[in-house]
Amino acid sequence: KLANRSLLFDDAGEVVAEYDKIHMFDVNLGAESYRESDNFTHGERAVLAETPWGGLGITVCYDLRFPALYRALAQAGAGMLAIPSAFTVPTGRAHWHVLLRARAIETGCFVFAPAQCGTHYGRRRTYGHSLIVDPWGEVLAEGGETPGVIAANIDLGAVAEARVKVPSLRHDRPFALPARLATE
C-alpha cells in the first residue's frame, strides 16, 4: 500500500519533515463513497517540524476532523498548522471553513490549508477554497474553486496574543471517560 504523505522542504530543496496521514477517509456520503484504506496505509505519528518561523504541525485532509491531534501539536510547540487537503464538494461546502476555523481557535495557531479543486478522473470533485486562518479564527486569505495562489501577511505574535486571551491549552485537564452507553 501507499502512504498519503506530506513533505516539508527547506529553502535548499531538501526534505526536512515527512508526515503520513493518520486517519483514512473511509466514508459513505450517499451518492459518493470512499475507502482510502483500500489503497493507503495509515501513519502512526504526529509530526512537528522546526522552521525558521517556529513550530509547524503537519497533517493531511481528513485528519482535520480529529481535534486531539491538533491540540497535541499545539501543546508540543506548533504555532502554525499545515493541512493540505482534497475535501469533496459535499463535505467541503458543509464543513471545510468551520473545521479549519475551529482548529485555529482551539489551538491558537495559524492554519495554512492548500486545497485541491476541480474534477478528477471524470468523477471525483474536490472543493478547493484554500484558506489561511489566523489564531483568532479569522480568514486572512481564501482561494476559490479554480487553481490559484493565495497569500497573507501574518504576525506570529498573534499566536501568543490569542493564547493569552484564551489560554485553553494551559487549562486543558485530564478527565475520566464516561462509560459507553449500550446501543441497539
Regions found by a protein language model. Give the residues of each.
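A short C-terminal boundary segment appended to hydrolase-like catalytic domains
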Residues: 157-184
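Short helix-loop capping/hinge motifs at secondary-structure junctions, enriched
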Residues: 14-17, 138-140, 160-161
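Active-site catalytic loop in hydrolytic enzyme cores
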Residues: 1-76, 89-98, 164-168
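Active-site/binding-pocket entry motifs
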Residues: 24-25, 88, 118, 158
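CN hydrolase (nitrilase-like) catalytic-core segments centered on the catalytic cysteine
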Residues: 55, 61-150
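Short beta-strand-to-turn element immediately C-terminal to the catalytic PLP-Schiff-base lysine
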Residues: 8-10, 133-134, 152-153
